Curated annotation (Swiss-Prot):
Gene name for this UniProt entry: TGFBR3L
TM stretches of this protein: 245-265
Main location: membrane
Organism expressing this protein natively: Homo sapiens (Human)
Leader sequence residues: 1-16
Protein name: Transforming growth factor-beta receptor type 3-like protein
Length: 292
């Protein structure tokens, strides 16, 4: 009986186990467009040169830093807008002490300068560049530059107004960062303008190592009104002539020889005589008489 029940349970289609809904599929991996960076933020201590660095930029305090923001992959369909930039002692762009550099693409610090824009690539947006002086505002050896950027999509099939016969006068020079035409809110409907607090803002952060150069040694204190006279150099020791040296050596040799001879004579005269053997009696002398 038990074997029959087990056999029926193993047969397909006769199991009494409840069949639930099928399990949902495992979420697929994100597409390649999610893994690729949209922007690049580079720092340099030299204008127009932004090499790839293995570590953070290292600059002395109160020196100029050059910044370049660009699209990671240039495309004729996208434009770039640089909205805000600031320097903080924290790696997180949280509200707190910060040195504001840019607001809405305009300088917020007197040291911010915009170099002439580089020549654009065919069909690509120009990178945004500016420079600032890293003043010693924060007492931190590592500081962080935070920049907010946005990407604007160019619309296709938009008709542009015909160019006038007489060119208009050049616009006055702007003190703000020139934005790409796709991100400039011109109101002509040819592009999509983005506000500074829009949902398409991206914040990029780059660390900066700040070094403090050693001050030069201080000069000695001097009495006011008196000029400090340089100390004369110490005279070099004069070289000895060979003739006096030879005479001194000969005199020392003669004195040493005379002293040795005198000591030898003194020792010879003051030494005691050695005792000799006892004297024998001569045979011719008187002999003792024999007793009878």
């Amino acid at each position: 009986m038990l074997g029959t029940v087990l056999l029926l349970a193993l047969l397909p289609g006769i199991t009494t186990l409840p069949s639930g809904p099928p399990a949902p599929p495992f979420p697929a991996a994100p597409g390649p467009w999610l893994r690729r960076p949209l922007f690049s933020l580079k720092l340099s201590d030299t204008e127009d040169v932004f090499p790839r660095r293995a570590g953070p930029l290292e600059v002395p305090a109160d020196s100029r830093v050059f910044v370049q923001a660009a699209l990671a992959r240039p495309s004729p369909r996208w434009g770039l807008a640089l909205h805000r930039c600031s320097v903080t002692p924290s790696s997180r762009p949280a509200p707190g002490p910060a040195l504001a550099l840019l607001r809405e693409g305009c300088p917020a610090d007197t040291s911010v300068a915009f170099p002439p824009p580089p020549p654009p690539s065919p069909g690509a947006a120009r990178p945004a560049r500016f420079s600032f002086r890293l003043r010693p505002v924060f007492n931190a050896s590592v500081q962080f530059l935070h920049c907010q950027l946005s990407r604007c999509r160019r619309l296709r099939g938009v008709r542009r107004a015909p160019a006038p016969l007489t060119p208009p006068p050049p616009p006055p020079p702007s003190r703000c960062l020139p934005q790409d035409e796709a991100c400039a809110d011109t109101g002509s409907g040819s592009a999509e303008g983005l506000a500074a607090d829009g949902p398409h803002l991206h914040t990029l952060t780059q660390p900066i190592v700040v070094t403090v150069p050693r001050p030069p040694p201080r000069p000695p204190k001097s009495v006011p009104g008196r000029a400090v006279r340089p100390e004369p150099p110490a005279p070099a020791p004069a070289a000895l002539e060979p003739a006096p040296v030879v005479a001194l050596v000969l005199a020392a040799f003669v004195l040493g020889a005379a002293l040795a001879a005198g000591l030898g004579l003194v020792c010879a005269h003051s030494a005691p005589h050695a005792p000799g053997p006892p004297a024998r009696a001569s045979p011719s002398g008187p002999q003792p008489r024999r007793s009878q």
